[in-house]
Amino acid sequence: SFFGILLWLKKEEEIDFFTAFFGGGPAYICYFFQCLQNMLEKKNIKKKVSIELIVTLFNGTINFIEKEKIEFKDLIKRVASKGGTTEKALKYFSQNNRFDSVITTAINKAENRSKELSKNQS
């Protein structure tokens, strides 16, 4: 597929989670991009420039991860200096599992919707 790889599932019931997580994945990522773009535009950065900056940021990050074969947590450690700006933002994200909780809840809702749609087709 254009967005991913082919993966055979061991159990048919796993399809709902994979549909929710990976089927919607490009939209979730673009939603995050859109949030970043909105922030940049509020800082008077033009739309075209903001899109280029965001795409370059994500492409560079992905390319680095692939080239260095580095785990996400290790790249975070390399970027987030102790007491620095990135660490401050990451602490806010992780307070009460804030960011993780939003993502997990959203994917769970999508998974439940996939199950509902499957039942309606039976």
What does each model-identified segment do?
Residues 51-122:
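NAD(P)-dependent Rossmann-like dehydrogenase/reductase catalytic/cofactor-binding core
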Residues 21-22:
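Alpha-helical membrane segments and immediately flanking helix-loop junctions
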Residues 1-18, 28-69, 113, 117:
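Internal alpha-helical scaffold of NAD(P)-dependent oxidoreductase catalytic cores
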